[in-house]
């Protein structure tokens, strides 16, 4: 199974539609890539009733509510971590997590009671986690990151290729 962990609901995305990355800029690259690698039946998601079906994957966020100024506070991240911890506990052994950005990366580590020092964030990096879980890091697919070329479509697809290969082992 494949769990994608984002930052928080976007104002024009999940906060408005109820589905993570649906209807916002970050979702454009995410859903296109999910489709390309066989994790969804549609190439895009603009609204909840669009018949999107995710295949062997789920999308969640480190923070569950819309943060002020689109950046969650340390307290919001901490308060929501118990929900992420619960979601991770439900994963079967051998599942793969994708951390979209440093905040999601750190939230996953906190949920698993792991230290950030031992698991440094780096785009495309693979981390072995307890319970035979694996985490991959990626820069967040935000408008800012894609427009500044911090994250390109090719870079994002390379991480998904690693994940797809991991899941096919």
Tell me the role of every PLM-derived stretch.
Residues 1-121, 125, 129-169:
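A polyanion-binding, active-site-adjacent surface
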């Amino acid at each position: 199974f494949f769990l994608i962990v984002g930052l928080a609901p976007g104002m024009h995305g999940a906060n408005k539609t109820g589905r993570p990355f649906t209807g916002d800029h970050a979702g454009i690259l995410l859903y296109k890539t999910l489709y390309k690698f066989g994790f969804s039946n549609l190439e895009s998601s603009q609204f909840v009733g669009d018949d999107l079906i995710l295949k062997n994957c789920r999308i969640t966020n480190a923070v569950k509510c819309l943060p002020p100024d689109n950046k969650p506070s340390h307290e919001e991240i901490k308060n929501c971590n118990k929900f992420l911890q619960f979601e991770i506990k439900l994963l079967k052994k051998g599942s793969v997590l994708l951390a979209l950005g440093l905040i999601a990366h750190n939230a996953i580590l906190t949920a698993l009671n792991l230290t950030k020092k031992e698991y440094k964030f780096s785009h495309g990096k693979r981390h072995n986690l307890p319970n035979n879980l694996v985490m991959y890091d990626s820069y967040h697919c935000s408008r800012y990151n894609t427009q500044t070329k911090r994250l390109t479509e090719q870079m994002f697809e390379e991480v998904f290729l690693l994940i797809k290969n991991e899941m096919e082992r």
